[in-house]
Amino acid sequence: MAKNTTNRHYSLRKLKTGTASVAVALTVVGAGLVAGQTVRADHSDLVAEKQRLEDLGQKFERLKQRSELYLQQYYDNKSNGYKGDWYVQQLKMLNRDLEQAYNELSGEAHKDALGKLGIDNADLKAKITELEKSVEEKNDVLSQIKKELEEAEKDIQFGREVHAADLLRHKQEIAEKENVISKLNGELQPLKQKVDETDRNLQQEKQKVLSLEQQLAVTKENAKKDFELAALGHQLADKEYNAKIAELESKLADAKKDFELAALGHQHAHNEYQAKLAEKDGQIKQLEEQKQILDASRKGTARDLEAVRQAKKATEAELNNLKAELAKVTEQKQILDASRKGTARDLEAVRKSKKQQVEAALKQLEEQNKISEASRKGLRRDLDTSREAKKQVEKDLANLTAELDKVKEEKQISDASRQGLRRDLDASREAKKQVEKALEEANSKLAALEKLNKDLEESKKLTEKEKAELQAKLEAEAKALKEQLAKQAEELAKLRAGKASDSQTPDAKPGNKAVPGKGQAPQAGTKPNQNKAPMKETKRQLPSTGETANPFFTAAALTVMAAA
């Protein structure tokens, strides 16, 4: 750009010099021709001098035409990026030819002819002065045109810079929107994974509940069979057993209801996830629409830039066509100033619009953060509800196990009162094995529930503080459970000591004889004397809680503790 400007200035200086030289030379030639026409006809050298002057006049005419042609080419090619070196070379050749013609014109013979003809030097000097003034005026006009061109180029350059800055800012805004979209997609992916994982956990829980129901049905059926065998001699025990079964079924129904409530809580969380997912999809669509708007704005800016370029070309063409008219150039400058002001106003309006869009986007992001915080709190509440439901299920399971142990203990007492029949003893042992198996299955289900709860806690991504609180709660519960089991172990030891003391003082009753050929081994929890009525047999109670002692329940509790 600087090189082109330097070449242009040099060309203008050469043009001024060449124009002045041509004007002076033409003036001198004209004066010489006039003087040659008035010379006397009898002079011997006038013919040759006249011919020489005519030749010089033709030569100067050709030089004048060349200078006008070069000037016209300069104006025509200026807007198309003319080659400054070529133009300077042509001006040098024109200058050289002018100097050669001027030297020929100002030779000794010409000076003698001028002296003889008596040309008025004063008039020639006056004409030369007038011509120089005219040349200076034209040079001033050319300088003014040059200044106007420089100002127009500055205005066009300013417009280019402004549009380039707007284009860069639009690209940056588009990149920021794309980053926001990618972040939202990244946030949606783990939410979708959590929803899928929650669905899988719900399906697993449903399957576990069905399995638990089937196992409880099998256990109930086996218990019914055992009690039907014992019902032949103990109808009262059968009634109590039916009452216990009904109570157990009601408690099982309550446990099912609690589990269904927990499942509903999980379903509610799943629905909230789905709603949040739909909301995120809507936000992504909105951001994509904003991106399309920005793309359209960028294309509009490119069209405006192309229009500005076309306007620049049109302006340059108009300046080339209106160089001789200073008033029109001034008017064109005013038009350019008005266009620049209008462009500035448009740019300011675009900036305000973009600023409002960015502020609206920031508000939307803040609202999304608030919604996410509320959702997190809701998930926390759901997690607490799930924990409470788990605790309630564990409590109900423990109660069911205790009731079942009590029923089994009563069944064992009833079976022990049937004169030590081997069949009843085997049934009691089989019932004991089934109870232990049911306890093991219950323990495995409890472990599965704990694992499920752990998975839920991990899926909610608890903070370090919440993890510490949960760990403290679990440790406190484990400690309390250990203390309770220690107490039960002590009570079991006391119970065994009392049972040993009771077994040393059997109470014999006449009328009941041992069956020959059948060994009657003593059972745990029963006295060796089988002659007492089953309903009057004394039940041992725990000194701490007042409940009936059950060695099988105590062993099951120890097994649960070991598993924990």
From Swiss-Prot:
Coiled coil (residue ranges): 44-505
Domain of life: Bacteria
InterPro entries named in the record: LPXTG_anchor, M_anchor, SMCR, SMDRR, YSIRK_signal_dom
Motif (LPXTG sorting signal): 542-546
KW Ubl conjugation (keyword) present: no
Signal peptide segment: 1-41
Propeptide: 546-564
Membrane topology term: Peptidoglycan-anchor
Pfam families in alphabetical order: Gram_pos_anchor, YSIRK_signal
Disordered: annotated segments: 372-391, 404-438, 493-550
Placement of C repeats on the sequence: 285-319, 327-361, 363-397, 405-439
Designated name of the protein: M protein, serotype 12
Source organism: Streptococcus pyogenes
Biological classification of the source: Bacteria, Bacillati, Bacillota, Bacilli, Lactobacillales
Gene: emm12
